[in-house]
């Protein structure tokens, strides 16, 4: 049956708007990577020559980028009737957190950097879809790695200690007990922001970060050193099962990781074995719908987007993978936990648009 004309027209309009949005996201990536937003935040308003000099880019490119950003409504221009070389642009204060402040709760510019990383592996993705193979995480490169670390950084540094752990008062009390320093593991630690945050918020605790990606571990060590907690935070290049040999742990963090594990039951069983008596596991994973339904809301659409372009391919790159994809529903978390020997997961009453939180007990 032919698609009714109005429906086709609506789809054309939707894809046109998506193309505009995609182009603007890639321009945001350039602004982030080249330090253009930071230059405007620190020294604006600037004309093209001023931005070029401060950021070390060519003046002609600076002018075009500034014009594009102002047309997109991301930057403000003092006088759009001025000659092109004389126009001065600024980063509005209300946009600075979104685009130029890595610790701001509204900082979502790293999404653009993640998409740039995906762009670099599209040919490999097409081949993986044909062959049934995968695309290893490292293949996505520094852009995706830094984007992923950056998008998680504000929540891990601020919400984790002040909101997420606060939902488990007994765990917070254990972390603050200086008479018996607590041990914490951050499984799939990535850039180490969660490990750093726990160490900063709880000076008596010692934290081990574990991740398979060597480049991420190197980044995490730099972040811990810069934060002044390297004496209490250690990072290890290992998979999730490596936690079993480094315990016992009073708390294990599995933040935005469970859906990415190739062998999640094996990993959770190792984590269970690594828990100290009375220990807990905090899982944060996607707040997707309880069951598949189409069309879905924006969160469901985003998670399926990450799944087809990143999460599933990285999982398929590992042997004997469960190939969960990104869309990890609550019933699946329950099944995985019970298969690993845990009891019923407790869903914590934490309000969050993207994550659902589960507590597992020893």
Which residues does each predicted region cover?
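Long, low-complexity, charged/polar intrinsically disordered regions in eukaryotic proteins
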Residues: 1-18
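Conserved Class I S-adenosyl-L-methionine-dependent methyltransferase catalytic core
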Residues: 14-31, 38-39, 63, 67-179
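Short helix-to-turn junction characteristic of helix-turn-helix DNA-binding domains
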Residues: 40-44, 199
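Short acidic, hydrophobic short linear motifs in intrinsically disordered regions
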Residues: 45-53
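Conserved adenosyl
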Residues: 119-259, 264-266
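A short glycine-rich, Lys/Arg-flanked "PGG" loop and its adjoining helix->strand segment in the class I
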Residues: 265-277
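C-terminal alpha-helical "lid/dimerization" subdomain adjacent to the S-adenosyl-L-methionine
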Residues: 284-339, 346
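Core SAM-dependent methyltransferase catalytic element
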Residues: 341-362
């Amino acid at each position: 049956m032919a698609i009714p004309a109005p429906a086709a027209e609506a789809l054309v309009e939707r894809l046109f708007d998506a193309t505009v949005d995609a182009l603007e996201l890639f321009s945001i990536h350039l602004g982030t990577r080249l330090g253009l937003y930071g230059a405007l935040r620190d020294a604006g308003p600037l004309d093209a020559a001023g931005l070029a000099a401060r950021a070390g880019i060519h003046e002609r490119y600076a002018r075009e980028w500034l014009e594009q950003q102002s047309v997109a409504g991301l930057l403000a221009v003092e006088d759009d009737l001025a000659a092109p070389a004389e126009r001065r642009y600024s980063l509005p204060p209300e946009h600075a957190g979104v685009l130029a402040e890595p610790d701001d709760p509204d900082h979502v510019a790293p999404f653009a950097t993640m998409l740039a990383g995906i762009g670099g592996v599209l040919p490999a993705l097409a081949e993986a879809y044909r062959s049934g193979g995968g695309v290893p995480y490292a293949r996505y490169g520094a852009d995706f790695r830094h984007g992923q670390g950056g998008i998680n950084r504000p929540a891990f540094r601020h919400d984790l200690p002040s909101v997420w752990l606060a939902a488990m008062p007994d765990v917070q009390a254990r972390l603050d007990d200086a008479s018996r320093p607590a041990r914490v593991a951050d499984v799939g630690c990535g850039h180490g922001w969660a490990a750093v945050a726990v160490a900063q918020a709880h000076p008596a605790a010692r934290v081990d970060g574990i991740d398979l990606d060597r480049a991420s571990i190197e980044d995490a060590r730099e972040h811990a050193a810069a934060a002044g907690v390297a004496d209490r935070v250690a990072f290890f290049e290992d998979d999730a099962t490596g936690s079993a040999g480094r315990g016992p742990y009073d708390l294990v963090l599995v933040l935005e990781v469970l859906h990415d594990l190739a062998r999640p039951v094996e990993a959770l069983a190792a984590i269970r074995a690594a828990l100290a008596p009375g220990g807990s596991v905090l899982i944060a994973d996607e707040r997707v719908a309880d069951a598949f339904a189409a069309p879905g809301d924006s969160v469901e659409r985003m998670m399926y987007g990450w799944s087809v372009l990143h999460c599933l391919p990285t999982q398929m790159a590992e042997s004997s993978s469960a190939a969960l994809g990104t869309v990890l529903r609550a019933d699946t978390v329950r099944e995985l936990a019970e298969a690993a020997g845990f009891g019923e997961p407790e869903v914590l009453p934490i309000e969050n648009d993207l994550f659902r939180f589960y507590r597992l007990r020893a």
